[in-house]
C-alpha cells in the first residue's frame, strides 16, 4: 500500500522512508572498498511527465544521502515500454530490449565514473528482472566492474 502511494500516489516523501529501510537491509561493501555508485532505473520521459517525478531516482538519491554515497543518472530510457507488471513473463524481456542507453551528454566523465567501479542499480519493484538485466548490460558494457540490484520489493 505504501509502495503504491509512493509510485503512483504522489507521495514523494516516502523515498526517505524506503531508503532508510534499504539502508538497514542491504549488505555494506567490505571495509576499505570504494562505495558503489547508485544508479536509478530511469522512467521514459512521457511517464515521468505524466507522473511528475521519477520514483527510482528519488529513492536512489535518498539512499545516497543516508549512506553518503554518490547517485548518478547514467541511464536513459530511449523507448517507451509497457509496465512490466502487466506484461506476460515471456514478453518482459522483449518489452525492455534496447529500451535503455547511457546518457550521451556525460561523455568522458561517464567512463571515469564507471571504470572498474561497483554499481548498485536502484528501483522500486523487481518483477521478472528483465529491466534490471537490460540496465546492467548497459552499465557493464560501459565499464562497471559489477552491478547489483537494490529494490524495495519483488512482485
Annotate each language-model stretch with its function.
Residues 34, 70-155:
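PRPP/pyrophosphate-binding module of the type I phosphoribosyltransferase fold
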Residues 1-66, 73, 82-89:
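Extended interfacial segments that mediate partner engagement and assembly in macromolecular machines
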Amino acid at each position: 500500500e505504501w509502495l503504491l502511494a509512493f509510485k503512483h500516489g504522489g507521495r514523494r516523501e516516502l523515498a526517505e522512508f524506503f531508503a532508510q529501510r534499504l539502508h538497514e537491509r542491504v549488505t555494506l561493501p567490505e571495509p576499505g572498498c570504494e562505495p558503489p555508485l547508485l544508479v536509478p532505473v530511469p522512467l521514459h520521459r512521457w511517464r515521468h511527465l505524466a507522473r511528475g517525478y521519477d520514483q527510482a531516482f528519488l529513492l536512489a538519491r535518498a539512499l545516497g544521502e543516508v549512506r553518503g554515497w554518490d547517485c548518478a543518472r547514467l541511464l536513459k530510457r530511449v523507448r517507451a515500454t509497457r509496465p512490466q507488471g502487466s506484461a506476460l513473463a515471456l514478453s518482459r524481456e522483449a518489452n525492455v530490449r534496447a529500451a535503455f542507453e547511457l546518457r550521451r551528454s556525460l561523455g568522458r566523465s561517464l567512463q571515469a565514473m564507471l571504470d572498474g567501479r561497483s554499481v548498485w542499480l536502484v528501483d522500486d519493484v523487481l518483477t521478472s528482472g528483465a529491466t534490471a538485466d537490460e540496465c546492467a548490460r548497459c552499465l557493464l558494457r560501459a565499464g562497471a566492474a559489477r552491478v547489483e540490484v537494490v529494490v524495495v520489493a519483488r512482485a
